[in-house]
């Protein structure tokens, strides 16, 4: 009992000594506590802390930053969430009308008649879809939700149909704000059987013209260029007379990879600038630039001058007439042969809103202007896409002018198995 009482007295005396300390010691203690927080301003203004984030100068907001932040970010495309389809009010928000009795009118939206397309349900559409699924192939027609799929796939026979095969999977490493293709930083590995399966499918259909495109694969050292070129060579082996158009990415500006694809035996090298230079940072992934796209098209033509080069632009994003003129001049300066114009249509809620629905007569006007500037062919219309009826347009308007009658055998060069082996080994096919 005496020992317990002694302990209590000791604790009490220690507490009393702490309480009896002068208040002058407290400010030093408080200063130490405040300094333990990195974001707290010291009480003495003469004390400076260079590492303090609160002292860094913030850049004033800019119109570019505000506009970019208001739109979808890269993370929106890699979230893995399922896309929600747009309702008419969001997809066609620029065409509105007030309907209903007085005092209870409500605003509704109207779809321009020139943008209406039928629902794909033909037997030929189903046959092509089944063939693609059986060979584990993808098409940009489906992945990009092209409005022309019922027209392109709905012919009376497979030979009358047009399908754009999308190589290297259905997942892209870029997040362009207009495109509904799935996005991921780490897409699945390439299918080594895809070149052979693609060639097999196309040889079954007996097509005279095919369009190959691909997702961007920035995760691969060559951007997938060798895979792309090998597919072209396999197609030419199985169907030497088929005309092949390749709509490629920019391969992160690697012009050696551009040359590799250009030398693979294709007939048309296509790469889309998508929009005018001023809008490119808002529309495309930040890794894609307008000038880089021009360099790709220029390199393809320089590698093989007899190639047809082609590009495509979307209208309705907010571009001006002067900007379109500048774009066409830049394309002609590097000898691009074919250009197409189409209406941008917002695919999902995550993507850019439509700025304007361009009238069909305006598309006709730009077609005339492009032809007057020296383009060999221009397809221009609200529903025109880069590969829309590409074979028909190519055969009727480009090959007859540039290659004459013997176009079927013009692209048989460089299609031997020896070239395929060189390609896989990393050598350019000449």
Swiss-Prot record:
What SMART domains does the entry give? Answer: Elp3
Q: What stretch of residues directs this protein to its organelle as a transit peptide?
A: 1-37
Keywords noted in UniProt: 4Fe-4S, Iron, Iron-sulfur, Metal-binding, Mitochondrion, S-adenosyl-L-methionine, Transferase, Transit peptide
Enzyme class, UniProt record, top EC level = transferase
Residues annotated as binding [4Fe-4S] cluster 1: 141, 146, 152, 387
Region (Disordered), start-end ranges: 40-64
Q: Which CDD domains match?
A: Radical_SAM
* Gene Ontology molecular functions: 4 iron, 4 sulfur cluster binding; lipoate synthase activity; metal ion binding
Provide the residue positions that the database annotates as binding [4Fe-4S] cluster 2.
Answer: 172, 176, 179
List compositional bias (Low complexity) regions by residue number.
40-56
Pathway entry: Protein modification; protein lipoylation via endogenous pathway; protein N(6)-(lipoyl)lysine from octanoyl-[acyl-carrier-protein]: step 2/2
List the EC numbers from the record.
Answer: 2.8.1.8
- Which reaction does this enzyme catalyse, per its entry? [[Fe-S] cluster scaffold protein carrying a second [4Fe-4S](2+) cluster] + N(6)-octanoyl-L-lysyl-[protein] + 2 oxidized [2Fe-2S]-[ferredoxin] + 2 S-adenosyl-L-methionine + 4 H(+) = [[Fe-S] cluster scaffold protein] + N(6)-[(R)-dihydrolipoyl]-L-lysyl-[protein] + 4 Fe(3+) + 2 hydrogen sulfide + 2 5'-deoxyadenosine + 2 L-methionine + 2 reduced [2Fe-2S]-[ferredoxin]
**InterPro entries cross-referenced by the UniProt entry:** Aldolase_TIM, Elp3/MiaA/NifB-like_rSAM, LIAS_N, Lipoyl_synth, rSAM
**Cofactor requirement:** [4Fe-4S] cluster
Superkingdom, taxonomy of origin: Eukaryota
Where is it located?
Mitochondrion
Q: How is the cofactor bound?
A: Binds 2 [4Fe-4S] clusters per subunit. One cluster is coordinated with 3 cysteines and an exchangeable S-adenosyl-L-methionine.
Q: Where is the Radical SAM core domain?
A: 155-376
What GO cellular-component annotations does this UniProt entry give? Answer: mitochondrion
Q: Which family does it belong to?
A: Belongs to the radical SAM superfamily. Lipoyl synthase family.
Q: What is this protein called?
A: Lipoyl synthase, mitochondrial
């Amino acid at each position: 009992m005496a020992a317990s009482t002694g302990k209590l007295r000791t604790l009490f005396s220690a507490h009393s000594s702490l309480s009896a300390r002068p208040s002058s010691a407290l400010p030093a203690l408080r200063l130490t506590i405040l300094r333990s927080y990195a974001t707290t301003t010291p009480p003495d203004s003469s004390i400076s802390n260079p590492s303090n984030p609160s002292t860094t100068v913030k850049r004033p907001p800019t119109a570019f930053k505000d506009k970019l932040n208001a739109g979808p970010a890269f993370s929106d495309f890699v979230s893995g969430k399922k896309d929600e389809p747009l309702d008419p009010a969001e997809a066609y928000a620029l065409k509105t009308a007030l309907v209903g009795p007085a005092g209870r009118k409500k605003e509704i939206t109207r779809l321009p008649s020139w943008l209406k397309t039928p629902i794909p349900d033909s037997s030929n559409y189903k046959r092509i879809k089944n063939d693609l699924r059986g060979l584990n192939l993808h098409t940009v027609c489906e992945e990009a939700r092209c409005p022309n799929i019922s027209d392109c796939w709905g012919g009376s026979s497979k030979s009358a149909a047009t399908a754009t095969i999308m190589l290297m999977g259905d997942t892209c490493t870029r997040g362009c704000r207009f495109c509904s293709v799935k996005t991921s930083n780490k897409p699945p590995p390439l299918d080594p059987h895809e070149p052979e399966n693609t060639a097999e499918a196309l040889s079954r259909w007996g097509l005279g013209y095919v369009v190959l495109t691909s997702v961007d694969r920035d995760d691969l050292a060559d951007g997938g260029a060798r895979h792309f070129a090998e597919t072209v060579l396999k197609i030419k082996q199985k169907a030497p007379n088929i005309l092949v158009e390749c709509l490629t990415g920019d391969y992160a500006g690697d012009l050696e990879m551009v040359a590799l694809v250009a030398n693979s035996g294709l007939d048309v090298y296509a790469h889309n600038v998508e929009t005018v230079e001023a809008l490119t940072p808002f529309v495309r992934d930040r890794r894609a630039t307008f000038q880089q796209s021009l360099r790709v098209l220029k390199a393809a033509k320089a590698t093989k001058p007899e190639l047809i080069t082609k590009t495509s632009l979307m209208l309705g994003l907010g571009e001006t007439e002067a900007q379109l003129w500048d774009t066409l001049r830049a394309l002609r300066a590097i000898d691009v042969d074919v250009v197409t114009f189409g209406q941008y249509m917002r695919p999902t809620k995550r993507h850019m809103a439509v700025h304007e629905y361009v009238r069909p007569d305006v598309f006709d006007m730009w077609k005339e202007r492009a032809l007057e500037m020296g383009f060999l062919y221009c397809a221009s219309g609200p529903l025109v896409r880069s590969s829309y009826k590409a074979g028909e347009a190519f055969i009727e308007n480009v090959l007859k002018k540039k290659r004459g009658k013997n176009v079927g055998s013009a692209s048989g060069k460089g299609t031997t198995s020896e070239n395929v082996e060189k390609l896989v080994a990393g050598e350019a096919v000449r």
